[in-house]
Amino acid sequence: MDLTVLGKAAKAASFQLATASTAQKNQALASMADQLEAQSASILAANAKDIALGREAGLSDAMLDRLLLNESRLQAIANDVRNVIKLNDPVGSEIDSRVLENGMSLARRRVPLGVVGVIYEARPNVTIDIAALCLKTGNAAILRGGKETFFSNMELVKVIQSALDKAGLPAASVQYIEKPDRELVTQLLKMDDYVDMIIPRGGAGLHKMCKENSTVPVIIGGFGISHIFVDESADLDKSVAVIENAKVQRPSACNALDTLLVHQAIAKPLLDKLIAKLNGKVAFVAEPKAKALMSSAAELRDAQAGDFDTEWLSYTLGVKVVQDVQEAIEHMREHNASHSDAIMTNDLYNAELFVNTAGSAAVYVNASTRFTDGAQFGLGAEVAVSTQKLHARGPMGLEELTSYKWVGKANYLSRS
């Protein structure tokens, strides 16, 4: 497979997309959503092949859950695409404007990035999310999904390209790297003549490889250890309910809870309530102070080196007792708290201290970490959750897939 051919086609498509009307882009999105429903049988059959091969390969339950499509999930994906149609098109909008002393009218206008390359793992929904957001913002996309989702992604890309064709837009607006060859990923990372941004969605290894090898700007998204700290002033029953939601609702999600930090003053009653709620559902990994208070837990083991740096993506929860909010924050800083973190507290000072000093992309007071999501934030689908500080941070929606240009208008003005 010659990626240069894909790159040239994507760049050419990006020029046409940049001038496409909102109506034309929305037409393609509507067709995409309709075809996801109309072609559900073939999409789910392809996904069943991926699931069967994944089981044969010994994929974890968490990975299989990420890979799985069913009628309800496919319907939710189609609905997400329709929600993108409802969102304002940022392309062409003015960020700000002013009139200079020399009479020039100067504005910053949003424009597409150009060509976005996305490398991701066993999440077929990402294929549609990225295509929808890139299309709405006038960006072409080159996608490279994991080999675990090959058959699913092939069917989804057919739907996307058919929708583009029906709307009179180039099929090369969304292209897929079919071969799982790692060398092709390395080649994509060097294609700065054609690709304007790379977004890797996966584990720390993928992020490291992209940062070390890419000549294209990279936005790191998805990986990070999510924490909840329960302060001594918190309502314990309500805190347990939030912890259960953050851990159990969908443990394979990147915003699911990984580590629970508990203030020493309320550690015993909080952990008793938590164990009563989660026994049989969650395996606990605890440091010595916490473990000494958790004898009633059905599944409990000592925390080992590296456990508090682990994104579990499963029904496993790290637990640590801390002295106060400051120790909780220090623990988070030492253990890659870059994604989503929360404090349960009724103390306004501690809440503000946590919000102002936690280094995460999304920080919550008395709310689950599970809210870090483009749809939950009202952004529509998301292309990634950025855990870095440039160029975007948190869920990357439409505006985060644009840049801007300066536009100056005058009456034949020359600089003096």
From Swiss-Prot:
Location of this chain's protein in the cell: Cytoplasm
Keyword Oxidoreductase tagged: yes
SUPFAM superfamilies per UniProt: ALDH-like (SSF53720)
A Pfam family of this chain: Aldedh
Gene Ontology CC: one annotated term: cytoplasm
Known pathway: Amino-acid biosynthesis; L-proline biosynthesis; L-glutamate 5-semialdehyde from L-glutamate: step 2/2
Enzyme class: oxidoreductase
EC number: 1.2.1.41
GO function terms (MF aspect): glutamate-5-semialdehyde dehydrogenase activity; NADP binding
CDD domains per UniProt: ALDH_F18-19_ProA-GPR
Family: Belongs to the gamma-glutamyl phosphate reductase family.
Name listed for the protein in its UniProt record: Gamma-glutamyl phosphate reductase
